[in-house]
From Swiss-Prot:
Annotated gene: tatA
Name of this protein: Sec-independent protein translocase protein TatA
Its membrane topology: Single-pass membrane protein
Organism of this sequence: Nitrosococcus oceani (strain ATCC 19707 / BCRC 17464 / JCM 30415 / NCIMB 11848 / C-107)
HAMAP family registered for this protein in UniProt: TatA_E
Family the UniProt entry places it in: Belongs to the TatA/E family.
UniProt entry keywords in alphabetical sequence: Cell inner membrane, Cell membrane, Membrane, Protein transport, Translocation, Transmembrane, Transmembrane helix, Transport
Annotated spans, Disordered: 45-90
Function: Part of the twin-arginine translocation (Tat) system that transports large folded proteins containing a characteristic twin-arginine motif in their signal peptide across membranes. TatA could form the protein-conducting channel of the Tat system.
Places the protein is found: Cell inner membrane
TM annotation in the entry: 2-22
Amino acid sequence: MGVGGISIWQLLIVLVIILLLFGTKKLRSIGTDLGSAIKGFRNSLRDEERRDAEEAATIEHKQAHKAENPSQRQQADADFKIKSGNDEHK
């Protein structure tokens, strides 16, 4: 038994017919084109994963930086409230 209920002999006959129809040069060029397309697809996936990792690292860095200085942020918020409160009384 072969693949999906197709015997090995049936697969060989189909392959011989394909070779006769397209020829080896055409099949070789199709294989090369298909290989190039797969390689390009893998490269684009790798680039996308790299970009996602860089974005995640940037976000983590920003969050860590914000977490390091909460007292400075609170002081800046307090200063802003004082300044904006003084502007209202003028």
